[in-house]
UniProtKB/Swiss-Prot annotation:
<feature type="region of interest" description="Disordered">
    <location>
        <begin position="1"/>
        <end position="50"/>
    </location>
</feature>
<protein>
    <recommendedName>
        <fullName>Uncharacterized protein C4orf46 homolog</fullName>
    </recommendedName>
</protein>
<dbReference type="GO" id="GO:0005829">
    <property type="term" value="C:cytosol"/>
</dbReference>
<feature type="compositionally biased region" description="Low complexity">
    <location>
        <begin position="20"/>
        <end position="34"/>
    </location>
</feature>
<dbReference type="Pfam" id="PF15725">
    <property type="entry name" value="RCDG1"/>
</dbReference>
<dbReference type="InterPro" id="IPR031457">
    <property type="entry name" value="RCDG1"/>
</dbReference>
<keyword id="KW-0963">Cytoplasm</keyword>
Length: 111
């Protein structure tokens, strides 16, 4: 059972079955179906604690945000490395330009 909890915590959250703007409205006060909660008066079987459901969704979101932060940090490091290489290349090209200009100027006849 611990394995299924680990798998559940590491997998991304499933999309909600329906959105609040789907046009389906209920005349009675019940828990939102779009969050995966069950209305005990409508369906038999075990109900999902809304707090537990929200905690699971927060955990899944935190996991996803952590992965996104790791990926962003990796890309940031690559961008910094690329910027350093571009700066080195610009310095190299400027040096060559200056050398070529000096060589060209030295070939001009003196007046």
């Amino acid at each position: 059972m611990a394995d299924s909890e680990e798998f559940r915590a590491s997998s991304p959250p499933p999309p909600p079955p329906s959105s609040p703007s789907s046009g389906a409205s209920s005349s009675s006060l019940s828990m939102p179906v779009s969050l995966g909660w069950r209305d005990p008066s409508r369906s038999p079987g075990p109900t999902v604690d809304p707090l537990e459901q929200v905690e699971l969704q927060i955990g899944d979101a935190a996991f996803s945000l952590t992965k996104l932060l790791e990926a962003t940090s990796a890309v940031s490091a690559q961008v910094e490395e690329l910027a350093l290489k571009c700066t080195e290349n610009a310095r190299f090209l400027k040096t060559w330009r200056d050398l070529l200009k000096e060589g060209y100027d030295s070939l001009k006849p003196d007046n």
